[in-house]
């Protein structure tokens, strides 16, 4: 990597509409960028943002979602992912390679943040306010990437604009990675625009929402409550009202939706320039028609699924619209997997081209903010506020007005004397049903230290995995270390001489 010339190939996706609903023209933003002459104008700064988003879309692909979903207590793997069943960790070569690609895409996104962060302060054709605003967006994106890196790979090399030309770089402790994440998000909260420039770019509230979420990891509950509360009280977001599971799928996660009132930060997709999302093909079955007419996706591998016998599914109230949004009973191979298998339906794209679907990737929803606020309030003894936030989510899930009290549905603060009672009596179910198939629930389990307990209580209670392994029913499960941290790819050790694979590889992975 040479300091004189550092080239990035930035291909713009259609990020979305502005507030006046005008499209970005991607043909204006295809560059071979030299840092010696670039990052001087708003258009060039925007190209830098789009280049990062393009890599983030690659990082949060089908494997990202599949790998995190199959770790939960209610999802079962098959195909390439079947080797991870039973919580033995990631051992399949193809699966390991895919996780390595996630690692590399996140670092490419970080690199595409670092370069403009080093150059924008010297921009010749922007005001100080414009420079600060674009840098705020880049700090947000870098923080998001490092947050997902540290949660899946643990200690990693900390590459910033200050050391980006240093190739050989040792791993930094998890605490140091979080320190950078917090620092970046504080800069983002200060400098991001008040409103997103385009659908799919961050604003101050995006940064506040992510900062609050990160604070839960750090047990900074007062901070989490304050900043999640700021986002809620801003009035910028609201829950979309729905009356059926199909309504949910169309209005909240619908194919081709430009945006919704609960989008805090999504990665945008477009069929026009093939900036699409392939995860739907991992959950779909090519012959299943969810409304009798449309397939979920034109291509389907159904690499993971759930089962009616799993207690999480078995106890899911059928009046809860999220149930019909998320699952459909479909016995795709009864002789192997039993009669009670269910496909995952949250994302539906009947107009997909093969595995390419125009469904925006919901990294940060308003419901995540409400869940963050509820958890933080309960942690700090404000049970009434915690319950109020959860009740909004639950009311909407049952087709009711989320802002109107509903005695038949509402949780009551008086029922929960402490956090544990609140966790088991309200928060756990609302979080796992609301974030079902969004690659979030496993991190929630890890943050609470509940993975072993929840897996043991649900995964093998009644549902054999697979059907041929009926002797496993009821047996104790040990969650391997490899379920918590993915394997750092070999390329990182081959080219980064500050790392030693025997010393620096994550636990459980052979050299």
Segments (PLM) and residue ranges:
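Residue-level detector of transmembrane insertion/anchoring sites
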Residues: 11, 309-310, 355-358
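Conserved oxyanion/phosphate-binding beta-strand-loop segments in alpha/beta enzyme cores
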Residues: 69-82, 103-104, 111
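Short, cationic low-complexity segments
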Residues: 285-306, 312-313
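Non-catalytic accessory segments flanking enzyme active sites
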Residues: 83-90, 113
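Bacterial N-terminal signal peptides
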Residues: 9-16
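Active-site-adjacent substrate-recognition loops and nearby beta-strands
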Residues: 277-285
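Acidic/polar-rich alpha-helix caps and helix-coil junctions
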Residues: 2-6, 20-67, 93-277, 317-511
């Amino acid at each position: 990597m040479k300091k004189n010339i550092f080239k990035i190939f930035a291909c713009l996706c259609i990020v979305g509409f502005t507030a006046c609903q005008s499209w970005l023209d991607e043909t204006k933003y295809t560059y071979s960028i030299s840092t010696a002459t670039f990052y001087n104008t708003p258009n060039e700064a925007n190209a830098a943002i789009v280049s990062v988003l393009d890599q983030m879309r690659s990082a949060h692909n089908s494997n990202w979602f599949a790998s995190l979903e199959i770790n939960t207590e209610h999802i079962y793997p098959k195909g390439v992912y079947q080797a991870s069943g039973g919580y033995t960790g990631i051992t399949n070569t193809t699966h390991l390679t895919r996780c390595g690609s996630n690692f590399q895409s996140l670092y490419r996104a970080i690199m595409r943040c670092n370069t403009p962060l080093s150059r924008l302060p010297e921009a010749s054709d922007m005001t100080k306010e414009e420079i600060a605003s674009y840098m705020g967006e880049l700090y947000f994106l870098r923080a998001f990437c490092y947050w997902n890196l540290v949660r899946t790979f643990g200690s990693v090399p900390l590459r910033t604009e200050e050391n980006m030309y240093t190739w050989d770089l040792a791993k930094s402790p998890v605490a140091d990675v979080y320190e950078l994440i917090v620092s970046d998000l504080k800069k983002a909260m200060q400098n991001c625009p008040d409103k997103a420039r385009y659908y799919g770019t961050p604003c101050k509230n995006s940064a506040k929402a992510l900062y609050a979420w990160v604070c839960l990891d750090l047990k900074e509950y007062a901070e989490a409550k304050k900043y999640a509360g700021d986002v809620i009280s801003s009035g910028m977001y609201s829950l979309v009202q729905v009356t059926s599971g199909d309504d949910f799928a169309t209005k909240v996660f619908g194919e081709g939706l430009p945006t919704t009132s609960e989008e805090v930060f999504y990665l945008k997709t477009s069929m026009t320039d093939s900036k699409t999302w392939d995860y739907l093909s991992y959950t779909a079955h090519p012959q299943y028609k969810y409304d009798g007419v449309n397939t979920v996706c034109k291509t389907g591998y159904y690499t993971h699924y759930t089962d009616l016998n799993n207690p999480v599914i078995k106890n899911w109230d059928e009046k809860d619209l999220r149930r019909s949004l998320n699952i459909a009973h479909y016995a795709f191979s009864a002789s192997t997997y039993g009669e009670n298998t269910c496909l995952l339906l949250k994302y539906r794209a009947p107009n997909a081209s093969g595995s390419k679907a125009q469904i925006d990737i919901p990294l940060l929803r308003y419901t995540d903010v409400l869940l963050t606020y509820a958890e933080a309030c309960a942690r700090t003894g404000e049970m009434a506020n915690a319950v109020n936030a959860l009740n909004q989510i639950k009311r909407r899930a049952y087709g009711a007005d989320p802002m109107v009290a509903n005695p038949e549905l509402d949780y009551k603060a008086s029922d929960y004397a402490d956090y544990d009672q609140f966790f088991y009596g309200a928060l756990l179910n609302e979080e796992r049903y609301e974030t079902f198939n969004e690659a979030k629930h496993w991190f929630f389990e890890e943050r609470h230290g509940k993975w072993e307990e929840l897996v043991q209580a649900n995964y093998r209670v009644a549902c054999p995995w697979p059907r041929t392994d009926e002797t496993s029913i009821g047996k104790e499960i040990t969650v391997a270390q490899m379920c918590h941290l993915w394997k750092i790819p070999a390329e990182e050790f081959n080219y980064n001489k500050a790392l030693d694979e025997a010393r620096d590889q994550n636990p459980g992975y052979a050299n």
